[in-house]
């Protein structure tokens, strides 16, 4: 699946020969990922094509004369789409030529040299494990080391991930983003403009039924237990009073197996809870508390008059969604490392032959989108296992073309836009090329 790459900022810089070049600020999941020149990306594309041939998406052509403003904007859009599409092929993202280039540009952007470093990775129970390595170690590498230290079976590592987590004095926490395999945890911490951020290990699946795949591994069971205890403490899970008392009794007895079995019956077990946000349903300006998991978006909505409504949106009825950056980046020579100030995620929902757009205004819009993609991916996997020949129609990411090496037949429906690209149409927003087929 494609990733949330965007290039909202580009700057003209003088070069050593007196000319000028364009430096593109590449963001991933709303955070500054790297700053690169067109020439660097062009050489990288040539290296990738030597390995993967013409199955790669088209790369923006060179211009030998000065570009007009329209041409410069078109190139930026093309580079953005290229990054989104090239990361959709797991063969590419697992390759050395892919990872090595992105490692270097991440380090270069923050002027970080490759050196020994000790990285603290926090477990759900608050303990941290020191991982000795290099500043250039990827999230995939750090996760492998963590798995070895914890005794986690290699075939279960994919059920977990490293996350950027923000902690607050009152004990609350906010999951900011899930680190991609090729991201560098050390640079992610250095580039974050948020206070009290740390790298945390959490399970990365949203179908509670997948717990059964992990229970034969003691280390995996320990991690699930830690996270369930934490989710109750943070009130992400919603046990009844009777369930809470029984869970406390099982916790005192250190009966992890029974604890996790009972947790499966608790409302919102295995869900991810977002920070309080606002939405437009059932009327503009409503407060919302979102929990995502088990193929649904669960919303606890506070109306302006103080009334509470609980609504659950089933993922099977979500037709498409859109993340939009509504703000304007000023002072482009400054750090500008996050796009979390003015974000919205809107999704189209079909119910009773009626389709309606719902809008959520949250700084975690990219992480919310990642969770929606994860639920779609898990549903696809389950359906494929049940019927390998089934053609699956799912909402996900758009603007890509089908290649012979990627036989997956999906309809893909995710997109990211900046405010300047939005159009008005009869009181609502529409987007260019919102829905396209294929990967």
From Swiss-Prot:
GO MF, one example: phosphatidylinositol binding
InterPro entries listed in its UniProt record: PH-like_dom_sf, PX_dom, PX_dom_sf, SNX17-31_FERM_F1, SNX17-31_FERM_F2, SNX17/31_FERM
GO-annotated biological processes: protein transport
One GO cellular component, as annotated: protein-containing complex
Family the entry assigns: Belongs to the sorting nexin family.
Name of the protein described by the UniProt record: Sorting nexin-31
SMART domains xrefs: PX
Protein's UniProt keywords contain Transport: yes
CDD domains: PX_SNX17_31
Short name of any one Pfam family annotated for the protein: SNX17-27-31_F1_FERM
Keyword line: Protein transport, Transport
Stretches assigned to the PX domain: 1-109
Region feature Disordered, mapped onto this chain: 384-409
Cysteines engaged in disulfide bonds, as pairs: none
Assembly mode: Interacts with CCDC22, CCDC93, VPS26C and VPS35L, associates with the retriever and CCC complexes.
Primary role: May be involved in protein trafficking.
């Amino acid at each position: 699946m494609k990733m949330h790459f965007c290039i909202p900022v580009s700057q003209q810089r003088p070069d050593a020969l007196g000319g000028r070049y364009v430096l593109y600020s590449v963001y991933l999941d709303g955070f500054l990922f790297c700053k690169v020149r067109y020439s660097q990306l062009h050489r990288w594309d040539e290296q990738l094509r030597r390995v993967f041939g013409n199955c790669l998406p088209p790369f923006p052509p060179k211009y030998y004369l000065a570009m007009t403003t329209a041409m410069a904007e078109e190139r930026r859009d093309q580079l953005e789409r290229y990054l989104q599409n090239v990361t959709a092929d797991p063969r590419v993202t697992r390759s050395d030529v892919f990872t090595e280039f992105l490692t270097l540009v991440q380090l270069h952007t923050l002027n970080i040299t490759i050196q020994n470093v000790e990285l603290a990775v926090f477990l759900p129970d608050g303990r941290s494990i020191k991982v000795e390595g290099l500043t250039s170690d990827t999230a995939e590498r750090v996760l492998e080391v963590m798995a070895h230290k914890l005794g986690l079976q290699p075939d279960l590592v994919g059920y977990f991930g490293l996350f950027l987590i923000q902690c607050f004095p009152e004990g609350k926490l906010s999951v900011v983003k899930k680190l991609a395999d090729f991201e560098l945890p050390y640079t992610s911490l250095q580039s974050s403009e948020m206070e009290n951020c740390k790298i945390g290990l959490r399970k990365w699946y949203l179908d509670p039924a997948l717990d059964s795949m992990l229970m034969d591994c003691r280390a995996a069971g320990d991690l699930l237990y830690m996270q369930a205890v934490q989710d109750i403490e943070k009130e992400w899970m919603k046990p009844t009073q009777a369930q809470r008392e029984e869970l406390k009794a099982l916790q005192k007895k250190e009966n992890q197996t029974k604890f996790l079995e009972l947790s499966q019956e608790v409302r919102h077990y295995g869900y991810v809870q977002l920070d309080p946000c606002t939405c437009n349903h059932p009327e503009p300006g409503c407060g919302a508390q979102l929990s995502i998991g088990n193929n649904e978006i669960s919303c606890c909505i506070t109306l302006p008059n103080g009334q509470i409504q609980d609504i659950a949106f089933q993922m099977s009825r979500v037709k498409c969604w859109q993340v939009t950056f509504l703000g304007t980046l000023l002072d482009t020579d400054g750090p500008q490392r996050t796009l979390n100030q003015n974000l919205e995620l809107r999704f189209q929902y079909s119910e009773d032959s009626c389709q309606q757009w719902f809008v959520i205004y949250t700084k975690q819009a990219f992480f919310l989108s990642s969770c929606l993609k994860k639920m779609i991916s898990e549903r696809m996997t389950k359906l494929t296992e049940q019927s390998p020949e089934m053609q699956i129609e799912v909402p996900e990411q758009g603007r890509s073309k089908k290649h012979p090496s990627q036989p997956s037949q999906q309809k893909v429906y995710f997109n990211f836009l900046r405010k300047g690209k939005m159009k008005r149409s009869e009181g609502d927003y529409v987007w260019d090329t919102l829905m396209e087929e294929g990967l």
